[in-house]
Amino acid sequence: MNKAVVVFSGGQDSTTCLVKALNEFDEVHAITFDYGQRHRLEIEVAQNLAKELGVAAHKVMDVTLLNELAISSLTRDDIPVSHELQENGLPNSFVPGRNILFLTLAGIYAYQIGAETIITGVCETDFSGYPDCRDDFVKAMNSALVKGMDKPLVIQTPLMWLNKAETWALADQNNALQLVREKTLTCYNGIVGDGCGDCPSCHLRKVGLNDYLDNREAIMASLVEKQHAESK
């Protein structure tokens, strides 16, 4: 049986990855991490979506230790989310080590259930703010997991080379545009759906959606072209 584990936050990107995986794999597991994130609603949204979409299993894992180690506006209520980059060149919403931890734990979970594919929604679009969303980071993590567990394992990143408009196109391609738009939580201020419209995450989401809706045919064609190139 072809199994996959999706790292799932209940946001736009991971939900798009999840609906795509459900169309491609025999058995799909979702894993969500409780790291003391700013908005507890994120976990509830993920649980509701996992149930609605009918995943084989949804694991919510307690990793609140990360909250103690990683100081970020996403883990501390007293740190306002800022659009500005800090002195280190990163936004204060960056949680150091988050994707290292998440992919490691997802790899362990995949090992236990006999899955050889992990799917995560990271993409180079986010590289300006998040170094652990880079393609070379994911490849390094993939190599480390394979060597460390002596097991064939592939980390898939369906969004890696897509812009936000193409990510919306991917949701539409999998008949989930409205679900992703209305039921996911991407907003740093904890508002489901279209969000607050002001935080960096909402801004990126809104610009991408408007671009897709205004240029649907061209952007879908661009997505399909990238998919064909990736499959060669």
UniProtKB/Swiss-Prot annotation:
InterPro entries: QueC, Rossmann-like_a/b/a_fold. Its cofactor is Zn(2+). It catalyses: 7-carboxy-7-deazaguanine + NH4(+) + ATP = 7-cyano-7-deazaguanine + ADP + phosphate + H2O + H(+). Transmembrane segments: none annotated. Keywords: ATP-binding, Ligase, Metal-binding, Nucleotide-binding, Queuosine biosynthesis, Zinc. It is an enzyme of class 6 (ligase). Binds 1 zinc ion per subunit. One of its GO terms (biological process) is queuosine biosynthetic process. ATP binds at residues 8-18. It comes from the Bacteria. Zn(2+) binds at residues 187, 196, 199, 202. One of its GO terms (molecular function) is zinc ion binding. Pathway: Purine metabolism; 7-cyano-7-deazaguanine biosynthesis. Pfam families: QueC. Its EC number is 6.3.4.20. Catalyzes the ATP-dependent conversion of 7-carboxy-7-deazaguanine (CDG) to 7-cyano-7-deazaguanine (preQ(0)). Belongs to the QueC family. PANTHER family: 7-CYANO-7-DEAZAGUANINE SYNTHASE. This is 7-cyano-7-deazaguanine synthase. It comes from Vibrio vulnificus (strain YJ016).
